Amino acid sequence: MRGGGVPLAIIGGYQRIETPALWFWLRVIAHALWQLAFARKDAFPEVLVLEYAADKPGDISYLLSIAKPHVGVISAIGSVPVHAEQYPTGTEGVIREKGKLVFALGAGDTAVVNADDVSVKTLLSKIRARTIVFGQSHGSAVRITHISHTMKGDKIEGLVFKLETASTSLPVFLPHVFSVAHASAVAAGVCVGEAFDINAIDALQAIEASYAPIGGRSAILEGMKDTQIIDESYNSSPLALETALQSLTSVYGPRKIAVLGDMLELGPYTIQAHKDAGALAARCVDVLITVGNRARIMAQEALDKGMSENAVHVCETARDGLEILQKVFRKGDVILIKGSHSIGLESVVQEMTKVGK
């Protein structure tokens, strides 16, 4: 959530309507004044959950000046973080900026951090707050184990795993969800529940009752001609793409296609990050379609790693990628679609999931 989004969420005036910017902000100010003067105290939520984005240096400091949390969660940073090109010192700068979120917490607060992320782990020794760690690593307070996908024939039904705490082991099933990153999200949620004295069983029951995939965030969709579309079109980064591709390795039976777009804002890490993605794609998919100039690097690396020329296709635009995909896909294929938001791969998802095709 950007700088303007946080105060809007706090006052509850965040629903954007189609109106000129001036009138929108006048409406927000009027709503805020009304809330201060007339709203009942019990009308405001007891717990407010805010996303603090670190697009550039200083973002977290600014957001903390608006609202300092009692619970801070750092889910992932990665060795090559998103928005790295906005930071003069690269990964180190991103770690330092995101670390401000948990460093601002006091002794009576709680930090929830991912034990699997090497960059996140560098922050642990500097945190003053009570710290709860989650992940697949041994020693995690909430540990993720036995991750796989449930299949019905050649169809992916969802993600299944176990959450292990000091006192219990709980099975979890997330229907219509693909990436194992969702397991981390659930584990983090259980940790946050613990910060509010909610036991793991009750927290998990509440999560499972309401958990649903969001468009562009690893939802499993029904595609044309009995295909399954893994919609990760909203954005892409090295860590997220690696997770998505590796998740494909637990799917057996159907042919796997990846439509991968540029990963943007990586700065000096751009070439190597795309090479690494191409090498991984060569091991994980049967057909690779790349979209964008940077994604060409993926295609070339996949070829260099032994992928057949007939299985690698290079495209400039999302429209070109769609045309190639429609020529090469077969009935029953599993198709991963992922790229940075500005590449526009959501249009490929929309076309491939049209009813009646």
What are these regions (language model features)?
Residues V6, E51, L63, S75, ...:
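Residue-level signal for inorganic ion chemistry
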Residues P45, I66-S79, K121, V172-P213, ...:
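A conserved, hydrophobic alpha-helical segment in the catalytic core
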Residues V71, T110, V334:
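Short glycine-centered segments of the SAM/dcSAM-binding site in methyltransferase folds
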